[in-house]
UniProtKB/Swiss-Prot annotation:
Keywords: Menaquinone biosynthesis, Methyltransferase, S-adenosyl-L-methionine, Transferase. Its EC number is 2.1.1.163. Methyltransferase required for the conversion of demethylmenaquinol (DMKH2) to menaquinol (MKH2). CDD domains: AdoMet_MTases (cd02440). The lineage of its organism: Bacteria, Bacillati, Bacillota, Bacilli, Bacillales. Pathway: Quinol/quinone metabolism; menaquinone biosynthesis; menaquinol from 1,4-dihydroxy-2-naphthoate: step 2/2. Pfam families: Ubie_methyltran. Belongs to the class I-like SAM-binding methyltransferase superfamily. MenG/UbiE family. This is Demethylmenaquinone methyltransferase. The keyword Transit peptide does not apply. It comes from Staphylococcus aureus (strain bovine RF122 / ET3-1). Signal peptide: none annotated.
Amino acid sequence: MADNKANKEQVHRVFQNISKKYDRLNNIISFEQHKVWRKRVMKDMGVRKGTKALDVCCGTGDWTIALSKAVGPTGEVTGIDFSENMLEVGKEKTASMENVKLVHGDAMELPFGDNSFDYVTIGFGLRNVPDYLVALKEMNRVLKPGGMVVCLETSQPTLPAFKQMYALYFKFVMPIFGKLFAKSKEEYEWLQQSTFNFPGKEELKRMFEEAGFINVRVRSFTGGVAAMHLGYKEKDNTKGD
């Protein structure tokens, strides 16, 4: 528990400090591929109008905005993040969107009732949570039976050529970007470590299943440097019996 608390405090400091530069840093580090990946994920999701979505670790609100457009004016999107400064940037970006609400909170203790949302998403945020499985179980809890969960996250490439490029990128290129945009060594080292140490797609799929999700499928992007995990909460077949 002590390690989790220290980890959580470190991550909070990092994102509090990097909030105003986060969008630009994300674009540069991913060569703007995160936008392409998110569009493909949204296409796979097929979000229905008038539904309720939760964006966990919403950060500055990029995926929240995409969900807002997808659910339409009759739908609702809630974004939650533990960094107040990241949320402030997100609130500026979503100020004109009446179907969006951003709240401060913890991914491991979501402040919502059971079975509240049709969709729950998390984009490039799970790697920053101290306990992945606890967060996934919380996402399952607040998801409606039959609802969809989607995670878009960095992953470990499996193709040999991409594995070599990935290793070189993290060893030589990532530190340069980090030093340019981060305020301290702690910040860019965390960006490196959290990404490089994140589980591969098959291990993460097992975590999704352990958290209670079914029919989990995985889609890799750009040689496996990122991956989508999409699953469902089992339907409640006891109703009406």
